[in-house]
């Protein structure tokens, strides 16, 4: 039975998503259905946690909107995710960045930037 579940999960996992970690600043394009219309809604913020693995993996994204902190828990295998763009790579020493909830203003989104090395030819 366990092998069957793994086989089904392997066929459902999305491979088109970038490599993301807590501390990264991302921009999500989410499909929103209102009545009969469908549109894309952007949600830009810092990943403060990720949880689970495989098809049950979720991320928590936090942003400050009009001075109020807004968090969204998003399942990564959701068909409502159109795209995920990594705007900044964050350098963190923690897996859960819940301490960002206590901060206000610009400090609420401040995470050190990770240096990304590209091989030179």
UniProtKB/Swiss-Prot annotation:
HAMAP family: Ribosomal_bL19. Coiled coil: none annotated. The lineage of its organism: Bacteria, Pseudomonadati, Chlorobiota, Chlorobiia, Chlorobiales. GO terms for cellular component: cytosolic large ribosomal subunit. PANTHER family: LARGE RIBOSOMAL SUBUNIT PROTEIN BL19M, RIBOSOMAL PROTEIN L19. It comes from the Bacteria. GO terms for molecular function: structural constituent of ribosome. One of its GO terms (biological process) is translation. This protein is located at the 30S-50S ribosomal subunit interface and may play a role in the structure and function of the aminoacyl-tRNA binding site. This is Large ribosomal subunit protein bL19. Keywords: Ribonucleoprotein, Ribosomal protein. Belongs to the bacterial ribosomal protein bL19 family.
């Amino acid at each position: 039975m366990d092998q069957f579940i793994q086989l089904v999960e392997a066929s459902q996992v999305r491979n088109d998503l970038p490599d993301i970690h807590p501390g990264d600043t991302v921009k999500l394009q989410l499909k929103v259905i209102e009545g009969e219309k469908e549109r894309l809604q952007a949600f830009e913020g810092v990943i403060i946690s990720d949880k689970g693995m495989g098809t049950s993996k979720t991320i928590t994204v936090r942003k400050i909107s009009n001075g109020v902190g807004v968090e969204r828990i998003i399942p990564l295998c959701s068909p409502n995710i159109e795209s995920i763009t990594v705007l900044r790579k964050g350098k963190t020493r923690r897996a859960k960045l819940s301490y960002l909830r206590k901060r206000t203003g610009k400090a609420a989104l401040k995470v050190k930037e990770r240096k990304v090395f590209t091989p030179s030819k």
